[in-house]
């Protein structure tokens, strides 16, 4: 049974209040769908860059953007490219998982890890936990920094963590639950590699499910990457480097304080950015995006630039076969998402349905 040791210190209580105030401030900002999509994508790219950089990835932010958005390849950076592609796909999967499930589960966590390690593959099998001992060493001195639990204990420890998250007290704030889950996952170190990235994705998933995703606009990873020594120092709790010699029962209040400070910092940063970017006079229409599937979101973004589209445009945007694209256009026409403006059977043109036009800039 997992029973984390921590206290709600004055610092934790104060930071939680700051987080709540910043959360409500952002929710009330006038953000149009196009701006929201832009800020969301920026946050994903930032998270991908910083989370992989923490683990030693050598790509710059510009190179990460290039790798994700184009088919171009960087010289002698194949491994780095695969890492960022894998993380980016896993990050997108977090969003869909949070809509499909009201709780975290073991299968999704294993799938996230598989995507992280999949090098950009979208079809993968869930990762099994490690079957042997792993050791975390200092990159310079090679001395042992942390000795995680034995492989035979990993499965039970993970199940205990997941059950704790599911059954955590109703009055325990989501940010604290996310902080504890991050710490415990990193402590268990259930895989040989990819533990840090998966821990941060798990944190993001819990925040999404708990409605602390801030519309998907912020990146905690940047906060960690700005001072890596502080991040690792905050995680390094307990009297010994050995899990069984104090780490499993250590008081993690200091880690929670650090984690919440990062949240407050990130929330404040995106508030400032969104205020600068948002346009006065618009009501927040971003709730529309949560009602649309990912395909419709992409088409809505297309209509930000163009007046009409054809099934060939749908083919290119969504990477579909011609027949599938035509069938989808017909379905959307029936749903009044699209409306016909040119009745010719060949190269038939559509415009956005009347109901949805008001959501464009």
Please report, for each region that a protein language model flagged, where it lies by residue.
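FIC/Doc superfamily catalytic core
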Residues: 1-361
């Amino acid at each position: 049974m997992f029973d984390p040791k921590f206290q709600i210190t004055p610092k934790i209580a104060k930071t939680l209040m700051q987080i709540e105030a910043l959360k409500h401030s952002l929710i009330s900002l006038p953000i149009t769908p196009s701006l929201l999509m832009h800020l969301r994508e920026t946050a994903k790219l930032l998270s991908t860059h910083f989370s992989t950089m923490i683990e030693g990835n050598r790509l710059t932010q510009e190179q990460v953007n290039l790798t994700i958005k184009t088919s171009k390849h960087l010289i002698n950076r194949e491994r780095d490219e695969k890492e960022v592609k894998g993380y980016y796909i896993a990050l997108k999967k977090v969003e869909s998982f949070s809509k499909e499930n009201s709780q975290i589960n073991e299968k999704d966590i294993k799938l996230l890890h598989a995507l992280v390690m999949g090098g950009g593959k979208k079809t993968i099998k869930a990762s099994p936990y490690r079957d042997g001992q792993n050791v975390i060493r200092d990159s310079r001195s090679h001395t042992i920094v942390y000795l995680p639990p034995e492989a035979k204990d990993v499965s039970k420890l993970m199940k205990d963590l997941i059950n704790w998250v599911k059954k955590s007290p109703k009055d325990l704030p989501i940010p604290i639950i996310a902080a504890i889950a991050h710490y415990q996952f990193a402590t268990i170190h259930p895989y040989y590699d990819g533990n840090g990235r998966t821990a941060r994705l798990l944190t993001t998933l819990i925040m999404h499910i708990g409605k602390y995703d801030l519309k998907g606009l912020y990146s905690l990873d940047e906060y960690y990457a700005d001072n890596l020594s502080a991040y690792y120092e905050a995680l390094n709790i307990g009297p010994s480097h050995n899990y069984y010699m104090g780490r499993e029962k250590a008081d993690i209040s200091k880690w929670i304080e650090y984690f919440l400070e990062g949240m407050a910092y990130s929330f404040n940063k995106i508030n400032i950015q969104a205020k600068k970017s948002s346009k006065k006079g618009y009501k927040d229409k971003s709730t529309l995006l949560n009602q649309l599937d990912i395909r419709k979101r992409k088409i809505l973004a297309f209509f930000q630039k163009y007046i009409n589209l054809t099934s060939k445009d749908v083919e290119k945007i969504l990477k579909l076969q011609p027949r599938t694209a035509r069938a989808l256009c017909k379905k959307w026409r029936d749903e009044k998402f699209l409306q016909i403006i040119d009745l010719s059977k060949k190269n038939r043109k559509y415009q956005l349905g009347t109901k949805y036009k008001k959501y464009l800039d």
